[in-house]
């Protein structure tokens, strides 16, 4: 600081004082005002400024002993200001006034005697400024990084088969070990899908998945037709799923057939995360099924076409896992939705732990996991089939929200009639009519996953294929 005294000050005696006086006063006022506004709660901003000024004052004191009383004031002002500051908003003007006066004094004082003080003070003011000026707010949102892709392990039990399946989220390949147990159909999953938020891979649409496993169908008695093949009783069957897509008639829907599907344009504005380009023509009709899932969470990352499994296979949505596994809908189809679904984006892998089995097992209301539709989807309520018809309008809205997720394309009356509570029934209904379409998917996909399927089942498959051709065409 001393170096300023001899050279610089003499050279700039004329312009420097006036300029700095103005600058300093306004600067002090501004700092004070700002720190009062920004940091009312904690005196930290002020104490920082004043501490700096006090040290300056002491330094000045050392250099120039002839201005004791001026410094006396300078020392006082900070304490006064502090005092007011800590006692709330009322006295905020006081520190400002004091400080301004003293700032001016000081400026005058320097103006006549030694300008070298000004420069350092300016610098120190600048240093003191950011703490009082910018509240320290971390604006960065930290998201937990999750392992990319990952596996979903779930079990399906129906009649005498028990499959433990593990499906790779990325390429849709399943592996499973098949056990034989006497059990009615049940679906349980070990833990939710995990998807890497940063790479924006799309896991399966959990909402659609849940809707396809309502756990307890008794179509046979209701339809008066012959008993269905096992795989047609499975809520996860492709028939049922595609029936949701293609809107085949059932009791609740007035409009039927593909006409009832509401295709969503690729650039749909409503914040669903479809990546428009990721759909080719053949899968356009799958678009939007279940996509509402992403809406509630505002996670709109676009589908990332680079994520597709085999080159040319258009990714997961082309992979229609074969019928044998009971859960045979193409996982990735409504690909946007997995982003927003609570499972894929917002839960860590082990959060729900491996207790999934117990939780989902006999269709206990398993899901603490997903507050949304899942409790209802899994609950046993769907056992009564009239439930479908009398679905309460009370839940209409929820239902719409939920059911649009995976049923966008069914006619709207359909959606309205269903209450979230009976989500499952909705599937129950659809299974009825969905049997047929499942075949469609399966036919051009003839792989059987873990299929040690019995002959009886294959026979039944043929049976329902015929059913399909009558029913759905």
Curated annotation (Swiss-Prot):
Record region (Disordered): 57-143, 347-473
Biological source species: Plasmodium falciparum
Pfam families (alphabetical): EKAL
Glycosylation, residue list: 42
GO cellular component entries: extracellular region
UniProt keyword annotations, A-Z: Glycoprotein, Malaria, Repeat, Secreted, Signal
Biased composition (Low complexity): 95-104
Record's subcellular location: Secreted
Compositionally biased region (Basic and acidic residues): 354-375, 396-405, 423-444, 453-473
Coiled-coil regions, chain positions: none
Signal peptide start and end residues: 1-34
InterPro entries per UniProt: EMP3/KAHRP_N (IPR040805)
Function recorded in the entry: KAHRP might mimick human histidine-rich glycoproteins to anchor host thrombospondin or a parasite analog in a binding complex with the endothelial cell receptor.
Identification of the protein by name: Knob-associated histidine-rich protein
Compositional bias annotation for Basic residues: 57-87, 108-117, 406-422
